[in-house]
Amino acid sequence: MRELVETLDAIPLDDRTETLTTSITAEMVTLTDQHEHATEVRLPSDEIYVSVAPYRSQTHDCYYHSPTGCLGELRNADVAVTVTDATTGETIVDEELRTLDNGFVGIWLPRGIETSISITHDGQTATSKLSSVDDDAQTCLTTMRLA
């Protein structure tokens, strides 16, 4: 499952096709072909995949990530990502990552927690809250404006 999700999110923009659309919710990945035939694959019961697109000036509204449709501003950019459990203060993610060609960085989080996420790029930082508590939790975070 992880490999499928990460492969979909890493599709280079030039390789995107209009014959496949995808969506990632907190519960499953849905792949739909040009004939509207859909295949659903459940996500792990203990994890949720969240795609985050930090930005400076341009973003889009999104709640459920579409690896074949969403486009973030900072493509192939180095970012520092820190995710902290808002209740315990435990650091869940503390990594130097690179945004994908679509401008997003993908993060696997444990289910059932409230977190604080911080992303830094070129000396600018954005911070947000993110929840993996509900079955309809957000999987696309596009509101992290770097300042």
Model-found features: residue ranges?
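Extracellular beta-sheet/turn segments enriched in Thr/Pro/Gly and aliphatic residues
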Residues: 41-43, 48-55, 133-147
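Extracytoplasmic low-complexity, Pro/Thr/Ser/Ala/Gly-rich segments
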Residues: 1-37
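Surface-exposed loop/edge segments in extracytoplasmic proteins
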Residues: 88-96, 125-129
